[in-house]
Every structure is written in C-alpha cells, then in structure tokens.
Amino acid sequence: MWKFTSSATKRIGNSLSSNNNNGSLLFSLNFNGSNNNNNNESSKPITAANTQNNSTTKSIDNNNNNTNNSNSNNNNNDNIKNNNKFNRASHRSNITLVAINNKDISQMTNLLADSGISVSKISNKKISLASKINTLNKLNSSLLHLNSINNSLTNSNNNNDNNNLIDNNNNDNYNNDSISSSSSSSSLSESSQTLSSASSSASSSSSSTLSSSSSVSSKSLNNNNNNNNSRFNNEFNDVRVLGKGGFGIVFQCCNIFDQMEYAVKRIKVNQKIPTKELMEVRAMARLNHPNIVRYYGSWIEEEIITNNSIDHYGENDNNLFENIDSFPSSSYSSVSAAASSSSLVSNSSNSYSNNKATYISNSSSSSSSSSSCSYSIGNGNLSISECTNDDNNNYNQLKQKKFSLYIQMELCKYSTLRNLINEINNIKSITSIQSTSSIANPIGTNILISLDIKQCREITRQILVALKYIHSQGFVHRDITPDNVFVCQSPFGIKIGDFGLATTIESLTVDSNNNNNNNINNNNNNNKKVGGLGTYLYSSNEQEQGDNYNQKTDLYSVGVIFFEMLSQFKTTMERSTTLSKLKKSLSVLKTNPNLKQKYPNDTDFIDHLIQSFATRPFSNQISTDYDNFPPKNFLIN
C-alpha cells in the first residue's frame, strides 16, 4: 500500500486542523497493489511507505515540511523517477485518489504519469465540507503527509512549471463546483484509520458525509493520463458543465492566464483530423457577427483508452459533474438484458445524431477466469474501445488512441431561449434568469424580463438578422432551436450558436444537381442529405424527409420559434402536440385559431415563414427593420 498526499489538500488540512492543534494533517492517496508483497524496503522511495505485509502504517515525520520542502523537491523527484521497481510494482495497482477537488486529482494524476507509473484502475473520492473536521480527527494519528511528492511535479518540467500546478486558491470553489469524486463505495477503517480503496464497503460513524458516486473514475481521469500535454487541463480551471448531448459536452471554465470565462465544447472523435466535426470549427471561424456566438480557437487532444475506461461513445458524463440534472437538448435511454453470451447495455441518442451503442460480449469458462470486450458502434464504423481479461486478478491492458476536439467559444451568461421560454410559461416575469448551470448575471443584480409581444418580435428579428449573415457567408445552420439561441445581454442580446450540423449552401446545391440531372442513387451519393437531421419539431418537412432543400429550411425553424413564444405552452406535451400539428398543417389558423385572432399580423408573418419550400422566401428577401417588424410587405426587392 503506497500512500501520498498533495499540496492542495495540505493547505486545507492545515486550516481545518488548526482548531485542533494538529499541525499538518491530510487525506492520503493509497496504492493497493498485489505485486508489492515482495518489495524490499531498500528499494522503496523515501517518500512512500509499504504496508502490504504490516497492519501498522509506517509514517514519515513532516513537521518541518514547510522549511525543508524546497530542499527535498529534487531528491524526491529523482527517487520517484528512478525507482523502476516501484513503477513496476504499481503497474497492476488499484489507486485511490482521496482529495478535496478535481485540480488536486489532476495534479496527482500528473505525478503518476510523470513517474512512469502505469495502473489498471484509478478511483477518487472527494471529502465534503461537513465531514472534513471529523475525518481529520479520525485520520490524524496515521495518515502520511508527503507534500514533497506532489511538489516534485513542479520541478519535473521547469518550462511547464506554471501550467501544471495552478491552484489559484480556488479550493472553496472546487468544493462546490468541481468534478464529483467517484467510487462504488467508501469506508473508514477504525483499526488503520485510513480511507480504503474504491471497492470497500461503507462502515464508520464518521463516513456519513463522505460523498461518492458510481464508478466513473476512469472516465474522469482517462483524459488526464497525459495531463502534462493537455491544453484544456493546463489552461482552464473552475470547470463545470453547461450542457451535453449527442454532440458532446460543453463546459464553463476560466482561463488561468487572462482570467476570462469561456464555453469550451468537447467532441469525442475517432481520428486526429475529423473532417465532419471540423465543419463546425470552420463555420464558426468564418463568422463574425454581433448575433453569433464568438469563436476563439480549437485544438485536438489525444487520450488513452485503457481496459477500465468507459466506452468511447457511451460516456455518461452526468456522473462526472455536479448540478447538471437536465439538459433539454438530449435524451438518453438505457436497456439491459441478462444473457449468457451478450447484452445490449446502453443506448444514447438524440434528435440530431445517429444512435450509438455499447455492445458487451461476455464469456466465462470457470469461476477464476473471465473476459469481456466492448465495442463502439457509430456512423457505420466498428472499433474496439475496451477489452478486459480477469485471470486470478491479473489484468491485461489494451490501450487505444482516441481524440477529443475542443472548441473555445464565447460564454453567454444569462440563459438559452429554451430556458427563458420554459420559465415564462410558468411566470410572466423572471428574476435573475439563470442557465441550467446556475450562472449568475455578471453585474450581480436581478434581471426583470417579461416576454411580451414586443420582446417576442425583437428576438425573432435578431435571429433573422443572424441568419441573413450566416446565409450570406454560404452556410446553412440546419438546427435553429430555442436550445441553440442564447441570451447574452440584458434585456435581449440574442446570439446563435452550436454549428454542429451546419453545412455549406454549395454542398446542398451540388447534391441537388446530382439527384436531378444525373439520377444518382442516393445510397451511393457521398454528399446526400440525411433524412431526420435536426430537431424534429423545428426542422422543415423537406429537411426531415431528406428532400432537396437549401437555406430556406432555417426560416421554417424561425417561424416555429416565433409561434412558440406567442403561444406560451403550459406543458411539454402541449408544446409537442401543437408544434407537430403546425408541422403538418403549415397554418397558424388551422393549428391555433385563437392565436390567429389575437395576433393577426404576427401570425401572418409566421405563415409566411413556414409555408411550403417552393414558396418560402430566402432570408435576404425579408425586411428586418427594427421599427417595422414584422414587415407588412413580407418580401423586399
């Protein structure tokens, strides 16, 4: 059992234990490895203690750590790097990271990677605020405080000194907002008074507030195996989730250099240069408009998938972070079946992405030997993402290269139009509009918004202004929904984002010409339009059916959004039923006669936007004059 601690936890530990007159005390990091039995004491690093064959934990006195820490950094770093036996012994170890925040977890993961330690399982636990003092009291007599090990990471790469160990005194923020720790269960052993590994059972009076979530440690850390080379981990902190779905996951985070907040979108890809996903990047890079979410940059990072990591496409990120109860842009379903040979264990899908599933095949010949493999199925490609083999507790690792595309964008702090509409359906004015991630408005005051007819018109007008610009640059968005329209200013500064389904007008035109002039079979047409693309309630019939279409399809979506804002549905079922009816009838009068009577001019404009593809106007044919919107004469020369 190898035990360590880190600088971030030391500072919090010292502050919490000051009331108890317990100098430097903190949580430990345990390495429980079956190969440690034969280790010699002389071959161990001086900064670790081996307790595999002893019930009593050996400790190292660090009372003078604050004065001697700087002198021992280089020695400790050399001991870690040069001790090959320790590295080999840890190859099949179970590592439990016990820490205060995700930055602490990342730093310790850096240490493992920097030391050349390869492990088969990494688990972590986060200690809640309420339990820290009690835990400190219980662990005071036995936990090792080896701050120098974590500090050695600072000296391992002088050029990256500031990037790898940025703490910024944000520990209190991390306690509330950071990555949730993970482990199947937890225990506080009365005899050894140490936090056990992830697989132990919960058993202690002081463990009431030890937080743990189902085993997702590999997911939270598999992107950090080469953390020193991760731009995202080195340049951003205060990470929390804004939303997620089939497209990937979007984080709110703070850049450690300019101290500005950004939205960073992460998309898992199978190749280093993902042509399809880069369409979104290229679209955003070419667009510069006040009503479009600003693009700052993008990059690709390589990750290592091991035998304990979750399936590449089946990643369930809502276990990794706190306060992400709902994201309306995605839906998830889970199916499980017991069978001796195979089972379909998960399925993740949404209205604008292909279904992707994780397929598990299990077989066993005896109680002591079993194997399993999982495969990622998506877009017609099959790739192995996980294989495990258990033979008398010996694990074989399969490492496979995967990549993540990161897109750094402007952060819209107030809300999405979806959240705004949902709130308005229940109350006519909103106090302090916040997104699903509870982002307070930047000026710290309440925002009073009433979604009256004037506001509905202004939102619609700004969306059309943005679409005019997008279309003029040769792009079609294809997914204009309330979820992709962001409220970035008070009272209403509307911006369009999420260009994940954007394509060029030229590609749609080429496809149309191929189908009409050459009678090419759609199944063999590489540029063919896919039916069902987009979000069903907001996509036009021609786009839904995969017929020939162009930038006019975005105008149908705008008409539906305008209709929804005026209708103010009280339930999700009412919204779904009514918008489906509008999609079939293409008439406000046939869908909601009362609304037609209440807002005759506005509903006439909606009818103009949602009419059939052949007669629907282009965006540059619609007047967006502020004083005369919606226009009475719908078309302009």
From Swiss-Prot:
- Tell me one GO biological process term: cellular response to amino acid starvation
- Keywords, in A-Z order: ATP-binding, Kinase, Nucleotide-binding, Serine/threonine-protein kinase, Transferase
Enumerate the CDD domains for this protein.
STKc_EIF2AK (cd13996)
Q: So what EC number does this one have? A: 2.7.11.1
Binding site residues for ATP:
L242, G243, K244, G245, G246, F247, G248, I249, V250, K265
The active site consists of D479 (proton acceptor)
Example GO molecular function: eukaryotic translation initiation factor 2alpha kinase activity
- Per its UniProt record, what SUPFAM superfamilies does this chain match? Protein kinase-like (PK-like)
Give, as one word, the top-level EC class: transferase
Is ATP-binding a UniProt keyword of this protein? yes
What GO cellular component entries does it have?
A: cytoplasm; cytosol; nucleus
Q: Which reaction does it catalyse?
A: L-seryl-[protein] + ATP = O-phospho-L-seryl-[protein] + ADP + H(+); L-threonyl-[protein] + ATP = O-phospho-L-threonyl-[protein] + ADP + H(+)
Ranges where the Protein kinase domain occurs = 236-629
Region: Disordered, residue numbers: 36-88, 155-234
Positions with biased composition (Low complexity): 53-85
| Family membership | Belongs to the protein kinase superfamily. Ser/Thr protein kinase family. GCN2 subfamily.
What is the name attached to this protein's record?
Answer: Probable serine/threonine-protein kinase DDB_G0283065
Instruction: Give the source species.
Output: Dictyostelium discoideum (Social amoeba)
Question: Taxonomically, what lineage is the organism?
Answer: Eukaryota, Amoebozoa, Evosea, Eumycetozoa, Dictyostelia
